[in-house]
UniProtKB/Swiss-Prot annotation, chain A:
One of its GO terms (biological process) is intracellular copper ion homeostasis. Pfam families: CHCH. One of its GO terms (cellular component) is mitochondrial intermembrane space. A motif (Cx9C motif 1) lies at residues 30-40. Residues 27-69 form the CHCH domain. Required for the transduction of an SCO1-dependent redox signal from the mitochondrion to ATP7A to regulate cellular copper homeostasis. May be required for the assembly of mitochondrial cytochrome c oxidase. Residues 1-20 are annotated as: Disordered. This is Cytochrome c oxidase assembly protein COX19. The lineage of its organism: Eukaryota, Metazoa, Chordata, Craniata, Vertebrata. It comes from Mus musculus (Mouse). A motif (Cx9C motif 2) lies at residues 51-61. Its main location: cytoplasm.
Length: 92, 201
Protein backbone atom coordinates (compact mmCIF):
# COMPACT_ATOMS: atom_id res chain seq x y z
CA UNK A 1 0.00 0.00 0.00
CA UNK A 2 2.79 2.41 0.81
CA UNK A 3 4.28 1.76 -2.63
CA UNK A 4 1.08 2.65 -4.47
CA UNK A 5 1.42 5.28 -7.15
CA UNK A 6 -0.44 8.48 -6.40
CA UNK A 7 -1.85 9.96 -9.56
CA UNK A 8 -3.46 13.34 -9.55
CA UNK A 9 -2.84 16.13 -7.11
CA UNK A 10 -2.55 14.25 -3.81
CA UNK A 11 0.85 14.43 -2.22
CA UNK A 12 2.24 13.06 1.00
CA UNK A 13 5.46 14.27 2.51
CA UNK A 14 6.83 11.94 5.20
CA UNK A 15 8.21 13.69 8.24
CA UNK A 16 10.82 12.31 10.60
CA UNK A 17 9.65 11.58 14.16
CA UNK A 18 10.05 14.29 16.76
CA UNK A 19 12.60 12.41 18.86
CA UNK A 20 14.24 10.26 16.22
CA UNK A 21 14.41 6.50 16.12
CA UNK A 22 14.20 4.06 19.00
CA UNK A 23 17.42 2.12 19.41
CA UNK A 24 16.87 -1.54 18.69
CA UNK A 25 16.23 -3.69 21.75
CA UNK A 26 18.67 -6.35 20.59
CA UNK A 27 18.58 -8.35 23.82
CA UNK A 28 14.85 -8.14 24.44
CA UNK A 29 15.33 -6.25 27.70
CA UNK A 30 11.86 -4.73 27.60
CA UNK A 31 10.15 -7.68 25.97
CA UNK A 32 8.18 -8.60 29.08
CA UNK A 33 6.73 -5.08 29.29
CA UNK A 34 5.77 -5.27 25.62
CA UNK A 35 4.05 -8.60 26.16
CA UNK A 36 2.13 -7.19 29.09
CA UNK A 37 1.06 -4.26 26.92
CA UNK A 38 0.01 -6.50 24.03
CA UNK A 39 -1.97 -8.73 26.40
CA UNK A 40 -3.74 -5.65 27.74
CA UNK A 41 -4.59 -4.52 24.20
CA UNK A 42 -6.11 -7.89 23.35
CA UNK A 43 -8.10 -7.96 26.60
CA UNK A 44 -9.43 -4.41 26.12
CA UNK A 45 -10.45 -4.74 22.46
CA UNK A 46 -7.42 -2.71 21.34
CA UNK A 47 -8.52 0.49 23.06
CA UNK A 48 -5.37 2.49 23.62
CA UNK A 49 -6.81 4.59 26.44
CA UNK A 50 -7.25 1.52 28.65
CA UNK A 51 -3.64 0.36 28.25
CA UNK A 52 -1.77 3.58 28.83
CA UNK A 53 -0.33 2.39 32.13
CA UNK A 54 1.31 -0.53 30.34
CA UNK A 55 2.69 1.68 27.56
CA UNK A 56 4.06 4.06 30.18
CA UNK A 57 5.80 1.15 31.90
CA UNK A 58 7.30 0.02 28.60
CA UNK A 59 8.70 3.47 27.88
CA UNK A 60 10.03 3.73 31.42
CA UNK A 61 11.80 0.39 30.91
CA UNK A 62 13.44 1.73 27.76
CA UNK A 63 14.56 4.89 29.53
CA UNK A 64 16.00 2.91 32.42
CA UNK A 65 18.02 0.70 30.06
CA UNK A 66 19.40 3.50 27.88
CA UNK A 67 17.14 2.44 25.00
CA UNK A 68 15.43 5.83 24.91
CA UNK A 69 16.48 9.35 25.77
CA UNK A 70 15.22 10.19 29.27
CA UNK A 71 12.18 12.41 29.17
CA UNK A 72 9.67 13.51 31.81
CA UNK A 73 6.55 11.39 31.54
CA UNK A 74 4.42 14.54 31.33
CA UNK A 75 6.12 15.38 28.04
CA UNK A 76 5.22 11.94 26.70
CA UNK A 77 1.52 12.51 27.24
CA UNK A 78 1.13 10.71 30.58
CA UNK A 79 0.44 13.73 32.77
CA UNK A 80 -2.91 12.34 33.91
CA UNK A 81 -1.26 9.10 35.03
CA UNK A 82 1.25 10.79 37.31
CA UNK A 83 0.74 10.21 41.02
CA UNK A 84 -0.55 13.08 43.07
CA UNK A 85 -2.45 14.64 40.19
CA UNK A 86 -6.13 13.85 40.63
CA UNK A 87 -8.30 13.84 37.56
CA UNK A 88 -10.40 16.78 38.72
CA UNK A 89 -7.37 19.02 38.91
CA UNK A 90 -6.39 18.27 35.33
CA UNK A 91 -9.80 19.24 34.07
CA UNK A 92 -9.77 22.66 35.75
CA UNK B 1 11.07 76.64 -36.67
CA UNK B 2 8.84 74.90 -34.17
CA UNK B 3 6.03 76.77 -32.55
CA UNK B 4 5.50 76.95 -28.74
CA UNK B 5 2.41 74.71 -28.88
CA UNK B 6 4.33 71.94 -30.58
CA UNK B 7 7.20 72.19 -28.09
CA UNK B 8 4.76 72.01 -25.15
CA UNK B 9 3.13 68.96 -26.70
CA UNK B 10 6.49 67.22 -27.07
CA UNK B 11 7.33 67.99 -23.44
CA UNK B 12 3.99 66.52 -22.35
CA UNK B 13 4.64 63.35 -24.36
CA UNK B 14 8.13 63.05 -22.89
CA UNK B 15 6.74 63.39 -19.34
CA UNK B 16 4.05 60.77 -19.97
CA UNK B 17 6.58 58.36 -21.42
CA UNK B 18 8.70 58.72 -18.31
CA UNK B 19 5.67 58.04 -16.13
CA UNK B 20 4.76 54.92 -18.06
CA UNK B 21 8.35 53.69 -17.94
CA UNK B 22 8.43 54.25 -14.18
CA UNK B 23 5.25 52.23 -13.67
CA UNK B 24 6.45 49.40 -15.90
CA UNK B 25 9.77 49.22 -14.08
CA UNK B 26 7.99 49.25 -10.72
CA UNK B 27 5.71 46.43 -11.85
CA UNK B 28 8.70 44.38 -12.98
CA UNK B 29 10.48 44.90 -9.67
CA UNK B 30 7.28 44.10 -7.79
CA UNK B 31 6.79 40.86 -9.67
CA UNK B 32 10.39 39.87 -9.03
CA UNK B 33 9.96 40.56 -5.32
CA UNK B 34 6.66 38.70 -5.21
CA UNK B 35 8.24 35.66 -6.80
CA UNK B 36 10.94 35.65 -4.13
CA UNK B 37 8.38 36.15 -1.38
CA UNK B 38 6.08 33.44 -2.77
CA UNK B 39 8.06 30.59 -1.23
CA UNK B 40 7.91 31.78 2.40
CA UNK B 41 4.38 33.09 1.95
CA UNK B 42 3.21 29.78 0.52
CA UNK B 43 4.90 27.90 3.34
CA UNK B 44 3.22 30.18 5.87
CA UNK B 45 -0.13 29.64 4.16
CA UNK B 46 0.31 25.86 4.17
CA UNK B 47 1.28 25.87 7.82
CA UNK B 48 -1.86 27.70 8.82
CA UNK B 49 -4.24 25.79 6.56
CA UNK B 50 -2.47 22.43 6.42
CA UNK B 51 -2.91 22.13 2.66
CA UNK B 52 -0.60 19.84 0.77
CA UNK B 53 0.23 17.83 3.86
CA UNK B 54 2.94 20.23 4.93
CA UNK B 55 4.27 20.15 8.44
CA UNK B 56 2.11 22.13 10.82
CA UNK B 57 4.01 24.51 13.06
CA UNK B 58 3.87 24.30 16.81
CA UNK B 59 4.53 20.62 17.52
CA UNK B 60 6.83 20.08 20.45
CA UNK B 61 7.13 18.31 23.77
CA UNK B 62 5.46 21.25 25.49
CA UNK B 63 2.43 20.81 23.27
CA UNK B 64 2.30 17.11 24.13
CA UNK B 65 2.42 17.97 27.82
CA UNK B 66 -0.62 20.25 27.55
CA UNK B 67 -2.73 18.20 25.13
CA UNK B 68 -6.26 17.39 26.19
CA UNK B 69 -7.62 14.16 24.70
CA UNK B 70 -10.83 14.47 22.70
CA UNK B 71 -12.42 11.39 24.20
CA UNK B 72 -15.58 11.30 22.10
CA UNK B 73 -13.69 11.15 18.78
CA UNK B 74 -12.47 7.56 18.44
CA UNK B 75 -10.27 6.71 15.46
CA UNK B 76 -9.30 3.23 14.38
CA UNK B 77 -5.66 2.97 13.34
CA UNK B 78 -4.71 -0.10 11.32
CA UNK B 79 -1.16 -1.18 10.58
CA UNK B 80 0.50 -2.48 7.45
CA UNK B 81 4.01 -3.79 6.87
CA UNK B 82 5.88 -4.32 3.61
CA UNK B 83 9.40 -5.22 2.62
CA UNK B 84 11.08 -4.46 -0.65
CA UNK B 85 11.58 -7.47 -2.88
CA UNK B 86 15.32 -7.62 -2.27
CA UNK B 87 15.08 -7.53 1.54
CA UNK B 88 14.71 -10.95 3.10
CA UNK B 89 13.32 -9.89 6.46
CA UNK B 90 10.08 -11.02 8.00
CA UNK B 91 8.36 -7.80 8.99
CA UNK B 92 4.85 -7.52 10.35
CA UNK B 93 2.73 -5.52 12.78
CA UNK B 94 2.05 -7.08 16.16
CA UNK B 95 -1.47 -5.69 16.44
CA UNK B 96 -4.09 -5.49 13.75
CA UNK B 97 -5.55 -2.21 14.96
CA UNK B 98 -5.83 0.09 17.94
CA UNK B 99 -8.49 2.64 18.82
CA UNK B 100 -7.13 6.04 19.76
CA UNK B 101 -8.51 9.52 20.36
CA UNK B 102 -6.88 12.77 19.22
CA UNK B 103 -4.60 14.30 21.81
CA UNK B 104 -3.61 11.02 23.45
CA UNK B 105 -0.23 9.38 22.95
CA UNK B 106 -0.33 5.78 21.77
CA UNK B 107 2.13 2.94 21.39
CA UNK B 108 2.15 0.22 18.74
CA UNK B 109 4.60 -2.51 17.84
CA UNK B 110 6.07 -4.00 14.71
CA UNK B 111 8.33 -7.02 14.67
CA UNK B 112 11.21 -7.70 12.31
CA UNK B 113 13.25 -10.85 11.93
CA UNK B 114 16.34 -11.52 9.86
CA UNK B 115 16.12 -15.23 8.95
CA UNK B 116 19.31 -15.18 6.86
CA UNK B 117 22.78 -16.11 8.06
CA UNK B 118 24.38 -12.73 7.52
CA UNK B 119 23.68 -9.31 9.07
CA UNK B 120 21.32 -7.09 7.08
CA UNK B 121 20.78 -3.36 7.45
CA UNK B 122 17.28 -2.15 6.66
CA UNK B 123 15.86 1.34 6.46
CA UNK B 124 12.18 2.10 6.44
CA UNK B 125 9.79 4.76 5.32
CA UNK B 126 6.13 5.13 6.12
CA UNK B 127 2.88 6.26 4.60
CA UNK B 128 -0.40 7.40 6.14
CA UNK B 129 -3.74 6.84 4.43
CA UNK B 130 -5.84 8.95 3.96
CA UNK B 131 -3.24 11.53 2.99
CA UNK B 132 -5.14 14.43 4.45
CA UNK B 133 -4.97 12.75 7.86
CA UNK B 134 -1.19 12.54 7.59
CA UNK B 135 -0.81 16.14 8.67
CA UNK B 136 -2.39 15.26 12.01
CA UNK B 137 -0.41 12.05 12.52
CA UNK B 138 2.63 12.89 14.65
CA UNK B 139 5.24 10.32 15.52
CA UNK B 140 7.22 11.02 18.66
CA UNK B 141 9.59 8.13 18.15
CA UNK B 142 9.68 5.13 15.84
CA UNK B 143 12.19 3.23 13.72
CA UNK B 144 11.88 4.98 10.37
CA UNK B 145 14.49 6.87 8.35
CA UNK B 146 17.42 5.33 10.22
CA UNK B 147 19.40 2.24 9.42
CA UNK B 148 18.48 -0.74 11.58
CA UNK B 149 20.92 -3.61 11.67
CA UNK B 150 19.60 -7.09 12.36
CA UNK B 151 22.14 -9.79 13.03
CA UNK B 152 21.67 -13.32 11.66
CA UNK B 153 18.49 -14.96 12.98
CA UNK B 154 17.77 -11.90 15.15
CA UNK B 155 14.24 -10.78 15.88
CA UNK B 156 13.40 -7.46 17.51
CA UNK B 157 10.35 -5.47 18.55
CA UNK B 158 10.04 -2.13 16.83
CA UNK B 159 7.81 0.32 18.70
CA UNK B 160 6.02 3.31 17.22
CA UNK B 161 5.06 6.03 19.69
CA UNK B 162 2.66 8.53 18.16
CA UNK B 163 -0.36 10.73 18.68
CA UNK B 164 -3.04 12.32 16.55
CA UNK B 165 -3.18 16.07 16.88
CA UNK B 166 -6.22 17.36 18.82
CA UNK B 167 -6.92 19.73 15.92
CA UNK B 168 -8.00 16.64 13.97
CA UNK B 169 -11.34 16.84 15.79
CA UNK B 170 -11.84 20.45 14.62
CA UNK B 171 -11.12 19.93 10.92
CA UNK B 172 -14.35 19.71 8.88
CA UNK B 173 -12.54 17.71 6.21
CA UNK B 174 -11.78 15.02 8.80
CA UNK B 175 -15.40 14.57 9.91
CA UNK B 176 -15.78 11.38 7.88
CA UNK B 177 -12.32 9.99 8.64
CA UNK B 178 -12.53 7.35 11.35
CA UNK B 179 -9.94 4.94 9.93
CA UNK B 180 -6.26 5.73 9.47
CA UNK B 181 -3.83 3.20 8.04
CA UNK B 182 -0.15 3.39 8.92
CA UNK B 183 2.11 1.56 6.47
CA UNK B 184 5.81 0.91 6.88
CA UNK B 185 8.08 -0.37 4.15
CA UNK B 186 11.58 -1.65 4.80
CA UNK B 187 14.29 -1.46 2.16
CA UNK B 188 17.77 -2.89 2.26
CA UNK B 189 20.48 -0.28 2.84
CA UNK B 190 23.29 -0.78 0.35
CA UNK B 191 26.85 0.10 1.30
CA UNK B 192 27.71 3.67 0.42
CA UNK B 193 24.35 4.49 -1.10
CA UNK B 194 22.85 7.80 0.02
CA UNK B 195 19.14 7.35 0.49
CA UNK B 196 17.11 10.51 0.06
CA UNK B 197 14.00 11.10 2.13
CA UNK B 198 11.28 9.90 -0.24
CA UNK B 199 8.28 11.89 -1.30
CA UNK B 200 5.25 10.69 -3.22
CA UNK B 201 3.76 13.01 -5.82
Amino acid sequence: MSTAMNFGTKSFQPRPPDKGSFPLDHFGECKSFKEKFMRCLRDKNYENALCRNESKEYLMCRMQRQLMAPEPLEKLGFRDLMEGKPEAKDEC
Amino acid sequence: SSNPFQRAQEDEWRRRNKTVLTYVAAAAVGMLGASYAAVPLYRLYCQTTGLGGSAVAGHSSDQIENMVPVKDRVIKVTFNADVHASLQWNFRPQQTEIYVVPGETALAFYKAKNPTDKPVIGISTYNVVPFEAGQYFNKIQCFCFEEQRLNPQEEVDMPVFFYIDPEFAEDPRMVNVDLITLSYTFFEAKEGHKLPVPGYN
